[in-house]
């Protein structure tokens, strides 16, 4: 596990303790019991791929630990509308406050402004956060394999699916991928960013794609910047993408999405 991830997880443990003191787990469990159905995150991804189109998870992200503030003029609802118009299949919204300047409110604002399913992009390590995601209105959660033991991975993914949430498991190397595919989740994300060096290489996805079972949707994450990057992936059978920073630096995120993925079809 990288030093930055250790730091984030230590902070996350404190945050969970603070939140559960304010809103007890039992209250979240009760509130999660009578909610509308989710929008179907994995189904939306699969529908785009079945139609022969790229399935794009477009990210709503203000800042990151490595880059600082990426988008100072940050309005999640407007970004969500722009992404939907640009052809996104789903959204990803950062909710981590301390390291990414995210917010639960950003997820709710983005989701209310559009009809797309939404991933809560956070560091989920505790059942409390799974119930919290469902109550917030998320349609999918992220589980980062390098942050979890095998039993945690199984328990958290099982709870999420029991609550009607889809799960995207994120891996960085082949050892993590072998662990990830042991849990029956629909979406496997390969992050092309090395957590130790922060260097990005699309070869990471290409080297690992054959080890992803055919019944899972393989999502390539980080480093998709040009139309040739998209074409490289699609020509190798990778049709699902999570893209954030490239769009967040553009004046019109949805137009940047359309230009990257759909202007060359």
Curated annotation (Swiss-Prot):
GO terms for molecular function: indole-3-glycerol-phosphate synthase activity; phosphoribosylanthranilate isomerase activity. Gene3D superfamilies: Aldolase class I (3.20.20.70). Keywords: Amino-acid biosynthesis, Aromatic amino acid biosynthesis, Decarboxylase, Lyase, Tryptophan biosynthesis. The keyword Lyase applies. InterPro entries: Aldolase_TIM, Indole-3-glycerol_P_synth, Indole-3-glycerol_P_synth_dom, Indole-3-GlycerolPSynthase_CS, RibuloseP-bd_barrel. Its EC number is 4.1.1.48. GO terms for biological process: L-tryptophan biosynthetic process. It catalyses: 1-(2-carboxyphenylamino)-1-deoxy-D-ribulose 5-phosphate + H(+) = (1S,2R)-1-C-(indol-3-yl)glycerol 3-phosphate + CO2 + H2O. Pathway: Amino-acid biosynthesis; L-tryptophan biosynthesis; L-tryptophan from chorismate: step 4/5. It holds the Pfam family IGPS. It comes from the Bacteria. Belongs to the TrpC family. HAMAP family: IGPS_B. NCBIfam families: PRK00278.1-2 (NF001370), PRK00278.1-6 (NF001373), PRK00278.2-4 (NF001377). This is Indole-3-glycerol phosphate synthase. The gene is trpC.
């Amino acid at each position: 596990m990288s030093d930055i991830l250790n730091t984030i997880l230590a902070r996350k443990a404190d945050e969970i303790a603070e939140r559960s003191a304010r809103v007890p787990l039992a209250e979240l469990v009760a509130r999660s019991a009578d909610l509308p159905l989710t929008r179907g995150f994995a189904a939306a991804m699969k529908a785009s791929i079945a139609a022969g189109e790229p399935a794009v998870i477009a990210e709503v992200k203000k800042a990151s630990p490595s880059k600082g503030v990426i988008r100072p003029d940050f309005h999640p609802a407007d970004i969500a509308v722009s992404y939907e118009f640009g052809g996104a299949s789903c959204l990803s919204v950062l909710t981590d406050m301390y390291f990414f300047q995210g917010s639960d409110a950003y997820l709710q604002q983005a989701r209310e402004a559009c009809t797309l399913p939404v991933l809560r992009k956070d560091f989920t390590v505790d059942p409390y956060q799974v119930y919290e995601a469902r109550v917030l209105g998320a349609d999918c959660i992220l589980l980062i394999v390098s942050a979890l033991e095998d039993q945690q991975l199984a328990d958290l993914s099982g709870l999420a699916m029991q609550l009607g949430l889809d799960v995207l498991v994120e891996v960085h190397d082949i050892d993590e991928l072998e662990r990830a595919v042991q849990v029956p989740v629909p979406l496997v994300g390969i992050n092309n960013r090395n957590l130790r060096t922060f260097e990005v290489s699309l070869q990471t996805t290409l080297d690992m794609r054959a080890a992803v079972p055919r019944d899972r949707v393989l999502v390539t994450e980080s480093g998709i910047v040009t139309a040739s990057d998209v074409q490289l992936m699609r020509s190798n059978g990778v049709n699902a993408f999570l893209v954030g920073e490239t769009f967040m630096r553009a004046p019109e995120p949805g137009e940047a999405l359309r230009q990257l993925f759909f202007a060359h079809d």
